[in-house]
Amino acid sequence: MTLHCVVALFALISSCLATAGPEPGVQCALSPVNASHPVQALMESFTVLSGCASRGTMGRPQEVHVLNLRAADQGPGQRQSEVTLHLNPISSVHIHHKPVVFLLNSPQPLVWHLKTERLAVGVSRLFLVSEGSVVHFSSGNFSLSAETEERNFPHGNEHLLNWARKEYGAVTSFTELKIARNIYIKVGEDQVFPPTCSIGKNFLSLNYLAEYLQPKPAEGCVVSGRPQEKEVHIIELIAPNSNPYSAFQVDIIIDIRPSRKDPELVKNLILILKCKKSVNWVIKSFDVKGNLKVLAPNSIGFGRESERSMIMTKSVRDDIPSTQEKLLRWALDNGYSPVTSYTVAPVANRFHLRLENNEEMRDEEVHTIPPELQILLDPGALPVLDHPPSGEGAARHGGLPFPFPYIPRRGRQDGGKDRLPRPKDPVVPSIQLLPGPREPQEAQGSRDVALSVRCDSEKMLVAVEKDSFQASGYPGLELTLLDPTCKAKTNGTHFILESPLDGCGTRHRRSAPDGVVYYNSIVIQAPPSGDSSGWPDGYEDLESGDNGFPGDVDEGDVALSSRPELVVFNCSLRPARHPSRAQDPPTRNVTFSMDLYTTDLFLAPAQGVFSVAENGHVYVEVSVTKADQELGFAIQTCFISPYSNPDRMSDYTIIENICPKDESVKFYDPKRVHFPIPQAETDKKRFSFVFKPVFNTSLLFLQCELTLCTKREKEPQKLPKCVLPDEACTSLDASMIWAMMQNKKTFTKPLAVIHHEVQFKGPSTKESNPISPPIFHGLDTLTVMGIAFAAFVIGALLTGALWYIYSHTGDSAGRQPVPTSPPASENSSAAHSLGSTQSTPCSSSSAA
C-alpha cells in the first residue's frame, strides 16, 4: 500500500511539472481588439476650448473661478453624469487660505465629485451649480465650511463672464471645456496674471485642464484563455504620439483593474512591454492583489502608494525584441508561458488591463498550490484511515500513510524559520514545496556573511563586507535585491544596497503594537552569461530533476553560478513618540545648487539644456549656502544616464561614494564666499570630466547626489565627518555611507549630445602633423563697417588734395613764356613737359 502511494505521488508531481512547462508552439492570429479583449489602448490628452486668467481679484475678499462646460461628442444614451473636480493650489502657494467662489455651469445636471489637496479647512467656499446638479465632498471637514447653491446661468462665454463680473466685481479664471471625467483646477492668484480676464481661443495653462481619454485602434489576440497560475500579457507600442521626430521621454500608463467589482481579486501577473521610442512605463494597479512583474527595455516606474495594490517588481531587459512572432518566442524561451494575450498599438499613451476573476487565490499565499497537492498541506482533505499510524511515526509523518522526505533549501537555517505560512495543524512541518513569504530575520541563509542593516521612513540600506565573501571563497560576485535592477554599489570595503520601502521587492507586515517590519533578500550570484528571470524567489526556472526528491544532486554540490543564494534581512520601524529638537533635519537652513559651465573659468553657468560634444569637457560646480560654518558637504554620487529618473542607476559612473570612478575627473579649488549676513557663507566644489559616448542617444541626464557632512569631531545630529575624495576611496565604511544617505539632495541636469568630430586638445603625438593649421581671425560687423567708412573718407580727402595740387600747378605752368628758338632737344623736352602737365587728374595722380 505504501509503495503504491509513493508511486502515485511521484506521478502526480511529474504531471504537475509537465503541465507547467512551456508550450511547444504559440498560435496568435491578430484581429482588431474589441471590448472583450483584456487590453485596451487609449490616448490621454489635456486641453480646454478657451479661457483666461487674471489677478483682478487680488484686492477682493474672494477668488472667483468660472467653469463653462459644453456637451461632449457622445452618441445617444451615453451622456455623462459625473465629473471629478480636482482642486489644489498653484505652484507659488503652499496652502491655500483665501475664500473661493466656483461657478460650475453645465448643459445637463451633473454630480460633481470634489477632490482637494492643500486647501485649508474652515475657509468659506461657495459652489454655484446649474439647476439639478449636486456637489459631493470627499472630506467631511471640507464640507463644513462649503455651501452649494443652484443658479440659472446665462448662455455663452461672454454673457457668463459679464454675469460673474457684475456679481463679484472680478474673475480669477474662466475656462470653457467639453465635459470630461476629470477636471484639474489650480486655485490661487499670481502677480504675473494680466489685470483683467479676456477670453481667448486655445487658452493654454497648466493651471486649468481637462483630461480626455480617446480609444485608439489596436490589434491583438488571446493566446491562452484557460485559467493559469499566472497571466502573461505582452503589449507592444509603436509610438507614444503622432510626432515621429519627438525625442522627449513620454510616460505610458498601464492601468490594471478587475473587469467587474468582485469582492477581491488575486492574480500573479507578468507584463512584457516593448516600445522602440524613449518611454517611461508607469504601472498602476487598483483592487487587485498578488504579484506583478514588469519586463521592458525602457524605464519602468510605479504609481503612488495608493496606486499600488499589488506587490510590484521590475526588470529592465535590453534583449526584448520587436514584432509579434519574436516577442511570443522570446516569452516562451525565457519561461514566461503560456502567454495570455498579445496587443500591439500604433499610437497610444495609456493602456487599460482588465482582469477576470477566473481563479481564486488566497491572500496569504501569492504562489498558488495545485489542488492535487492540497492533501499534502491540509490533513482535513484526507479520508479517515481505519488504522492510522500512532506514536512517533504519526508525529513525524503527520498522519500520512507514508514518510515524506525533507526537502533542503540552500542557505536556510535549521529549525524551519523560513517556511511557508502553515495551517494551525500542519501535516509536515519541514516540507518546502513552493516559495512563499519569508519570516523576517536579521540575516538568513548565508554562511559567514557580515552585514549591517539600517532603515528610516523612506528606505533601507544594507552594507555587506567584501572580506566576508573572500574568506568564504566567493570571489567575483554580483549582489542584487529581489528586484535584479536594484544592484549593489561598491567601494573599497563594502557592497552597498539601497531599497525604498515600497520598491526593489521589499515587503512589509505589521508587528505589535504599532511597528512595521520591512524585509527583502540579497541575491548572491556569480556573473551570469545571461539575464536571470528576476522572480523574487529565484526559483522560477526549475529544470526537471530540481524537485528535491531522492536521487537529485545535493544542492551543496551545485555551483554558485547555477543557483543564486539568498540572504534575507529585515528592519523594524516604529513611530517616534517623543521627537526632540536634536532630531530636526540639519537641512532646514541649507540651500543646495548645481550648475554646468563650458570652461574651467566657471564664469557664466549654462542655461537650459547643456550641449556637450563627444570627448568634450563638462565643468560642474556644486555649492551649499548655510549658516553653520562647521557644516560641510560632499559630492556623494554622480552618474550619466539616459533616464531622467535618478533612481534608475547607470553603469556610466563619474563619482561614487565621494570617490572618483572616472579617470578624467579633475577637481578645482574654488574660493569660499561670505555673505553680508552674519555667519552665512557658501561653500563650492568644482570638478570636470571628459564626456564619453557610452550611450547611443542624443539626450542624457547628469544625476548628482549631494550630502551634508560635519567638520566637528562630535556631531549631535549624527552627520558623517567630511572626508577628502582620496580618503573616501579607501576608508569609507557602512556607517558613514548610511549617514550620508539621510541628508542627500539630488540634482538632474539634461545633456544634449553633439554627434560630430571635435578636435580634442591633448598632447600631440609623433604621427600628428607638425604644421599647425592656419588660424583665421574674424572681425565683427561694426568693426568692418568702421574700417570701410574710414577708407572712404581717406580716399575722398586724398582725391581732393590731388585736385587742389593739380589746379595750382596747372595754372603756373600755362603762364610760363616759351622761347622763340629753342634747340631741337629743348623743344621736344618742352613739348613732352607740356603734354605731361596737361594730363588727366587720374594720370597726375598716378605720376604723383
From Swiss-Prot:
Source organism superkingdom: Eukaryota
Any one Pfam family match given in the protein's UniProt record, by short name: Zona_pellucida
Primary localization: membrane
Topology feature Extracellular, residues: 21-784
InterPro entries: ZP-C, ZP-C_dom, ZP-N, ZP_chr, ZP_dom, ZP_dom_CS
Membrane-topology descriptor: Single-pass type I membrane protein
Subunit structure: Forms homodimers and homooligomers. Interacts with DYNLT4. Interacts with integrin ITGA5:ITGB1; this interaction promotes the internalization and trafficking of ITGA5:ITGB1 into endocytic vesicles. Interacts with TGFB1, BMP2, BMP5, BMP7 or GDF5 and inhibin A via the ligand binding domains. Interacts with ALK3/BMPR1A; this interaction results in the cell surface retention of BMPR1A. Interacts with ALK6/BMPR1B; this interaction enhances BMPR1B-mediated stimulation of the BMP signaling pathway.
The protein's name: Transforming growth factor beta receptor type 3
Species in which this protein is naturally found: Sus scrofa
Upper lineage: Eukaryota, Metazoa, Chordata, Craniata, Vertebrata
